[in-house]
C-alpha cells in the first residue's frame, strides 16, 4: 500500500517518543519488518526511538523531552516528532480532565504538543498515535473518526487523520480510513 506519492529528497529525521512498548519487544517488531539494508543504514542517524518512557507530558515533561530531542539531533532539527500513544503521557491541564474531555484534549494539544514542537522544531510534522473508544462496528463504519477519544478536539487540530480498524473480527484484514482537512477525500484502503 502506497501512502506517499513523493519521497523526500533525503531521509527524514524522526524522533519517536513511545510510551507503550518495552525496548526489546520494540526492537523485535522493527526487525520483523525486514527493511532493506540501505533504509536501516539511513535510519541509524535519522531515526531515534525512545525505550518505553514513563513520563507525563506536563510542563516539566515538555522541557525534558525537548532536551532529549536536542541531544538526539544536535546538528539539525527533527523533521517529524511522533508521540505514541497520547494516553500514556496525557496531561489534561489544571482541571485534570481525561483524554475523552475535549477541553482537556485541546489543552494537551496546544499547551503540550505544540509547545514541544515550537521548542525544538517549529516546522516539524507531528504524528500522534491514539487509542480509540469502544464503538460498534456500525458506528465505526458510519463515522470512523468519532472513535477517537477526544474526537472533536483532535479532528479540529490535525490536518490528516488515519484510523486503522478490523471491519471483520473473524479476519486479519485491516482497513485504513483517511481523513484530510485540507484536501480531497481519499478512499479507504484495505
Mark where each language-model region is.
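Phosphate-binding/switch region of NTP-binding enzymes
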Residues: 15, 80, 88, 100-190
Amino acid at each position: 500500500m502506497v501512502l506517499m506519492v513523493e519521497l523526500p529528497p533525503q531521509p527524514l529525521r524522526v524522533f519517536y517518543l513511545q510510551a507503550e512498548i518495552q525496548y526489546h519487544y520494540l526492537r523485535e517488531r522493527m526487525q520483523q519488518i525486514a527493511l532493506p539494508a540501505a533504509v536501516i543504514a539511513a535510519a541509524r542517524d535519522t531515526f531515534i526511538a525512545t525505550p518505553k518512557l514513563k513520563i507525563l507530558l506536563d510542563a516539566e515533561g515538555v522541557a525534558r523531552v525537548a532536551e532529549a530531542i536536542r541531544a538526539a539531533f544536535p546538528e539539525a532539527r527533527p523533521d517529524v516528532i511522533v508521540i505514541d500513544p497520547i494516553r500514556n503521557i496525557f496531561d489534561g491541564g489544571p482541571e485534570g480532565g481525561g483524554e475523552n474531555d475535549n477541553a482537556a484534549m485541546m489543552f494537551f494539544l496546544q499547551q503540550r504538543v505544540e509547545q514541544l514542537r515550537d521548542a525544538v522544531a517549529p516546522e516539524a510534522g507531528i504524528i500522534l498515535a491514539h487509542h480509540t473508544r469502544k464503538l460498534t462496528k456500525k458506528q465505526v463504519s458510519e463515522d470512523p473518526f468519532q472513535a477517537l477519544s477526544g474526537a472533536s478536539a483532535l479532528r479540529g487540530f490535525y490536518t490528516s487523520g488515519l484510523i486503522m480498524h478490523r471491519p471483520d473480527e473473524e479476519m486479519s484484514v485491516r482497513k485504513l480510513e483517511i481523513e484530510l482537512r485540507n484536501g480531497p477525500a481519499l478512499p479507504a484502503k484495505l
